[in-house]
């Protein structure tokens, strides 16, 4: 997953959209240059709603690599003016064989039913519970199942300790993220090194080389 965040300031809606669109473009560059085999990117509901054409154009421009990317949606439905635009984008992505997931912002799936109904995610991600009680972790996963999410396709994020990892395994989560699973790392560089002229290559005459 290509994860992007800001430090020191809170981006506005359009700033966030530009950041996410740039991240989407970088993800495709990483795929094109074979820096990664598969990659996931996050798009907010607001970005999809306001920049729908730019989002679909990005996928159209890299159609030979769309089968290697997954999209994770997030956001608040209450702020959407046109939910049908988001739903239309989801349907379009799936028509391109692109899996679409949803990141839960609330601690329990029961608090996100409207968003889950809208996205109908192929997979979902939620933050690890703060409780150390195994029963609480099991209840969180049971709620996710009751909401229509498949346990083997629920990612629990924020696993920072071996104890949390053990609780996630015991509860039955399919996947997990966090430093206790694999520490975050910088994405591969996509900068192209400058090309140096060959020693035998002829050079254009300058004031210093003219005779």
Model features per residue range: what roles?
Residues 5, 74-79, 103-211:
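EAL-family c-di-GMP phosphodiesterase catalytic domain
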Residues 1-64:
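Bacterial c-di-GMP phosphodiesterase EAL domain
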Residues 35-39, 64-69, 96-100, 120-122, ...:
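Short, well-ordered coil/turn segments that N-cap beta-strands
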Residues 30-35, 61-63, 83-89, 136-138:
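A broad, low-specificity signal for short, low-complexity segments enriched in glycine/proline
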Residues 27, 54-58, 85-92, 112-115, ...:
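A general structural detector for well-ordered alpha-helical segments in enzyme core domains, enriched
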Residues 11-15, 80-84, 133-135:
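Short, flexible/disordered intra-domain loops and linkers
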Residues 39-56, 60-80, 85, 92-93, ...:
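Active-site beta->alpha loop and helix N-cap motifs at the rims of alpha/beta catalytic domains
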Residues 33-38, 52-54, 84-85, 203-211:
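Intrinsically disordered, low-complexity terminal regulatory regions
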């Amino acid at each position: 997953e290509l994860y992007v965040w800001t430090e020191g300031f809170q981006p506005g809606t359009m700033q966030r959209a530009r950041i996410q669109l740039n991240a989407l473009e970088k993800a495709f560059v990483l795929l094109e240059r074979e820096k990664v085999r598969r990659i996931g990117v996050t798009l907010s509901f607001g970005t999809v709603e306001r920049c729908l054409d730019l989002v679909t154009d990005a996928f159209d421009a890299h159609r030979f690599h769309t089968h290697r990317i997954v999209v994770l949606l997030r956001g608040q439905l209450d702020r959407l003016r046109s939910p049908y635009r988001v739903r239309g984008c989801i349907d379009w992505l799936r028509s391109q064989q692109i899996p679409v997931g949803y990141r839960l912002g609330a601690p329990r799936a029961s608090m996100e039913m409207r968003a889950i109904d809208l996205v109908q995610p192929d997979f979902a991600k939620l933050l690890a519970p703060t409780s150390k009680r195994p029963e609480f972790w099991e209840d969180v996963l049971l709620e996710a199942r009751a909401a229509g999410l498949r346990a083997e396709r629920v990612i629990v994020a924020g696993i920072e300790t071996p104890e949390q990892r053990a609780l996630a395994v015991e509860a039955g989560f399919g996947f997990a993220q966090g430093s206790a699973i694999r520490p975050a790392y910088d994405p591969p560089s996509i900068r192209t090194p400058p090309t140096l002229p060959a020693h035998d290559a002829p050079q254009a005459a300058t004031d210093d080389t003219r005779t």
